[in-house]
Amino acid sequence: MPSWLDDFLFTYGNLVHALGVNGLLALSMYVVLAVGQLSLGQAAFMGLGAYSSALMTLKLGWPFWAVLPLSVVVPVLFALAVGVPTLRLSGVYLAIATIGLGEVLRSIYLNVDYVGGALGLSGIPERANAFLIHGLLLLAVLVLWLVARSRIGRAMEAMREDETAAESMGVDVRRYKMGALLASAALAGLAGCLSAHVSSFIGPNEYGFEPAVTILSFALLGGIGNPIAPVFGAWVLTLLPELLRGLADLRLVVNGLIIVVAVLFLPRGLFGVPMRRVAARVRADAGASRAQPGARPT
């Protein structure tokens, strides 16, 4: 590794790690919003991934590379169990139900000594690194990009626009909803495992209501037009506190104002603005090329 890169990671390592982890969390929200669902269970799935991986490492002594895939399996199994009853709900009712599930898990973390209780778990081996985190983030973006441009992606878009119409066209709505929930759980669990193994500490308050809303804000700010958009939103909201560090207590106020403005005036997110401009330019160029000089109307 070049010395300058080593110095950069030593100085800004925590921020680089946060960019990757938050990018994965933004994708976990993207996949459920892509099918028109409002689930706020991503923080709960992240907590399951973090706690399961930390316990397997600390209590059982398992190596990180064995724990990493299992930290994805645990939240996926939980999502599979709770998905059947909760996916009967939609809109704000689904959001409330998933928040409730997250609070139940947080209460368990707080009150069970085996998982650290209110003090959390410390001394987790720091086995993850920036290259692994961002490599997995890039892989997730590529996979979701390909999915978005496949038959599955078109079905998801149809569900997001009009679930009833999509179902009438033969889209298996329940299957796609469950698939999106499981993918969301997998991505959030992966983010939890990576976060636990770079910070060496986890606590129950890291996976409550506030983190759930923050994850939602990643996708709202960036947009859900494609997988890159929510990652872009996550990076903006991750870097914003660093840029506003001098404002101290006003950082959260400014952060909230930016989210409100983005939702009101940028319904497709920040990433949608340049994409709309590019699309408009392409349409204008295409129209100009069709209008050949000297062509006479027929």
Which residues does each PLM region occupy?
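Transmembrane alpha-helices and adjacent helix-loop boundaries
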Residues: 1-298
